[in-house]
């Protein structure tokens, strides 16, 4: 039976390195002696329920670790469940009971080190690159045991679409990129390509691929994966020249101006491209060359395949200017830089520079890297340099941290959302006003936050290595990963400020004030001239450079950008900080808030909403925007943008009283309701909070009461809320799964609601 192990308890490895004793580390292990018949029955029931309801909800409820923790803590829900009838008025006691039920349920799910574990996946291009890399390096069996394979072979077939393909994520239409990758993954996992043609995942996927022209229509990322495996040719890829890393800082585009995730991925890809690395052919690789194309492999004209992309994958169309640019880069890169004397003078120097960057960034992130996609290419680059090198072995030791097991099987995560989920849950707990009931949980959560703050900048001369400051920030996953994120920093700092204001006899140990100042310095530093806040680094690149992006299935992938969600969170925390520490950088903070408010206002859409870059979508961003504006002192009565936001939400409230937004809003950049105007508890919680923040309870409380009824009646017997549609997104077109959002935003909304009802008593 699968068990989730936390932190140092997850085992040790001589090639692992850590900055904080593996705080937040999550490892799944299979223990043959760890289950009773009753526990096994419970797990199998969860798997059957997911399979039976797959047509309705595509994402797992992330139940396996939850069931494990609830068993280990002998959790029993003692607070009665509340049900509100149609004509019934909600009382404060009923709302508070629902809130407390949910809080006590989540308290039982806290890990020993203070964080809340959770899946952070959903993308269908995470699993296959790991399998391909481990197959190439000969370590597939080392990492993926028979039990791992069993779970992966549960996951990939059950997630496929009805047409036989796989989408970019578990809810999206089929794409060439993910269908090709998952087909290869199944074949490496020894699934027969032709067995039972009507039902076989491989047979149907292969038909889907061939019917649409074959694997030459895979986007660039997919082509790179196929090239290193040896089932595609590098000459059929857009160029990824390592010479890019030699560009001086005064160039309009250089290693320091690009988006950190693009940088992390492409530094490793450029090394592999510059070396023209290709795996040693195996019988399977030779078979795949025959299976992935409608014509023979020898007949493919690779130069013609370079710009191909299936219509199903083409979200960001490549213009004539882009095609001309990349054709010119290819000619210069391959016809000049790859020939004597430039190959020795420039290309080999560029490859060494790319490798230097890879090693630096690996060490700075404890070999976690920036996530599931760059991790694979970094690991493969280190193996290509030296199969027995310590660099590669350190990478291999970190692979287990990317694996997640749920009732739908095994999937690879981005790199975890431990800090993000934990800080949002702590804010909910603190807002519930039941501190005495959950004191030990709050203390553990606060301890996790304190220990997770980044207290140093990246090592060495980090500017030369294209890194920015990190001191004072908090990351998305854990301290070891080391990338500070501005929204995680804002929310974490606000949590710490709340704890700072508590009596000393309630919180055993408080944060050093200087570390609070460090966090403020980080937030002030990251603000752009336009008043907005980026996520990881300053948004310093010229926006026109996005026109040259080679990425076909996502948008805004070249540069760091400002986001309304990050900006709103920063306004909230800096407003609170200024009240608690009125003498620290007050004028700068006031200027920051004024500029941020103007930025938020400038991004409001014609319908009164804001576009969400990190969640689905307009409701998500409207919550963070209005929260920031209200913190800055703006009101419904005095500020038109808040009135327009409220009107937007009231207009789209459904007949049931809830809200539910389709993920199609993200790529379409226009609000679209869920099919059938269904309700989603996450969106309902977000919209409900906006209404309460704006004073809707004083104007007309009925829309809020209707929404509260939806949330209260949605709560399950044990205090959980139902898992519905995916609510995370990035780069406009790819969904991410945050299963804890169903608890966070439902309960957070109920904290607002109970306080509003209490004022009426």
Swiss-Prot record:
The keyword Isomerase applies. It holds the Pfam family SQHop_cyclase_C. One of its GO terms (biological process) is triterpenoid biosynthetic process. One of its GO terms (cellular component) is lipid droplet. The keyword Ribonucleoprotein does not apply. Its EC number is 5.4.99.-. The active site is at 487 (proton donor). PFTB repeats lie at residues 149-190, 593-633, 642-683. Keywords: Isomerase, Repeat. One of its GO terms (molecular function) is beta-amyrin synthase activity. PROSITE patterns: TERPENE_SYNTHASES (PS01074). NCBIfam families: squalene_cyclas. Belongs to the terpene cyclase/mutase family. This is Putative pentacyclic triterpene synthase 7. It comes from Arabidopsis thaliana (Mouse-ear cress). The gene is PEN7.
């Amino acid at each position: 039976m699968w068990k989730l192990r936390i932190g140092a308890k997850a085992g040790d490895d001589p090639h692992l390195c850590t900055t904080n004793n593996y705080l937040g580390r999550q490892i799944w292990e299979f223990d043959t002696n760890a289950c009773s018949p009753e526990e096994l029955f419970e797990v199998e029931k969860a798997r059957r329920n997911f399979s039976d309801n797959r047509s309705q909800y595509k994402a797992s409820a992330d139940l396996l670790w939850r069931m494990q923790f609830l068993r280990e803590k002998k959790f029993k829900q003692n607070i009665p469940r509340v049900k509100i009838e149609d004509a019934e008025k909600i009382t404060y006691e009923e709302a508070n009971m629902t809130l407390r039920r949910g809080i006590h349920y989540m308290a039982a799910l806290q890990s020993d080190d203070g964080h809340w574990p959770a899946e952070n996946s959903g993308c269908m291009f995470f699993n296959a690159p790991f399998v391909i890399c481990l197959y190439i390096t000969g370590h597939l069996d080392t990492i993926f045991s028979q039990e791992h394979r069993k779970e992966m072979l549960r996951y990939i077939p059950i997630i496929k679409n009805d047409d036989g393909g796989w989408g970019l994520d578990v809810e999206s239409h089929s794409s060439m990129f993910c269908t090709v990758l998952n087909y290869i993954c199944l074949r490496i996992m020894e699934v027969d390509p032709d067995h039972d043609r009507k039902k076989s995942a491989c047979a149907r996927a292969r038909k889907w691929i061939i019917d649409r022209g074959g694997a030459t229509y895979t986007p660039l990322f997919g082509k790179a994966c196929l090239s290193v495996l040896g089932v595609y040719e590098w000459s059929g890829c857009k160029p990824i020249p390592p010479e890019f890393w030699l560009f001086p800082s005064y160039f309009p585009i250089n290693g320091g101006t690009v988006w950190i995730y693009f940088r992390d991925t492409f530094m490793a890809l450029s090394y592999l491209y510059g070396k023209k690395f290709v795996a040693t052919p195996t019988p399977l690789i030779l078979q795949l060359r025959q299976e992935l194309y409608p014509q023979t492999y020898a007949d493919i004209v690779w130069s013609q395949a370079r710009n191909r992309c299936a219509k199903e994958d083409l979200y960001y169309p490549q213009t004539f200017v882009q095609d001309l640019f990349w054709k010119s880069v290819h000619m210069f890169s391959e016809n000049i830089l790859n020939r004597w004397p430039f190959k020795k003078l420039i290309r080999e120097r560029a490859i060494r520079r790319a490798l230097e960057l890879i090693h630096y960034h690996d060490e700075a992130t404890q070999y976690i890297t920036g996530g599931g996609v760059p991790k694979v290419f970094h690991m493969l680059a280190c193996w290509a340099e030296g199969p027995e090198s310590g660099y590669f072995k350190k990478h291999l030791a970190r692979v287990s941290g990317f694996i997640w097991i749920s009732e739908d099987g095994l999937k690879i995560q981005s790199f975890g959302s431990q800090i993000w989920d934990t800080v949002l849950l702590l804010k909910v707990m603190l807002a519930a006003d039941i501190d005495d009931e959950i004191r030990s949980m709050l203390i553990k959560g606060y301890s996790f936050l304190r220990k997770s703050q980044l207290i140093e900048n990246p090592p060495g001369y980090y500017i030369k290595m294209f890194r920015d400051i990190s001191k004072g920030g908090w990351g998305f996953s854990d301290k070891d990963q080391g990338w500070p994120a501005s929204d995680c920093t804002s929310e974490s700092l606000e949590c710490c400020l709340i704890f700072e204001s508590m009596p000393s006899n309630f919180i055993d140990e408080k944060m050093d004030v200087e570390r609070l100042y460090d966090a403020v310095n980080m937030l002030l530093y990251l603000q752009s001239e336009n008043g907005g806040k980026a996520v990881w680094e300053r948004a310093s690149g010229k926006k026109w450079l996005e026109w040259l992006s080679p990425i076909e299935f996502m948008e805004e992938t070249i540069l760091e950008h400002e986001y309304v969600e990050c900006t709103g969170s920063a306004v909230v925390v800096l407003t609170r900080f200024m009240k608690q520490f009125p003498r620290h950088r007050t004028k700068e903070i006031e200027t920051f808030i004024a500029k941020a408010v103007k930025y938020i206002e400038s991004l409001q859409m014609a319908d009164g909403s804001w576009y969400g870059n990190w969640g689905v979508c307009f409701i998500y961003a409207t919550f963070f925007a209005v929260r920031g504006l209200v913190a800055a002192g703006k009101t419904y009565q005095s500020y038109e943008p808040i009135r327009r936001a409220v009107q937007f939400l009231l207009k789209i409230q459904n007949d049931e009283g809830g809200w539910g937004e389709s993920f199609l809003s993200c790529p379409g950049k226009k609000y679209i309701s869920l099919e059938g105007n269904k309700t989603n508890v996450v969106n309902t919680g977000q919209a409900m909070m906006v209404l309460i923040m704006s004073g809707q309870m004083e104007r007309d409380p009925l829309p809020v009461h209707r929404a509260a009824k939806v949330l209260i009646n949605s709560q399950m017997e044990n205090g959980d809320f139902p898992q519905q549609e995916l609510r995370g997104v990035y780069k406009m077109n790819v969904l991410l799964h945050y299963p804890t959002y169903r608890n966070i935003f439902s309960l957070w909304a109920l904290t607002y609601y109970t306080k509003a009802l209490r004022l009426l008593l």
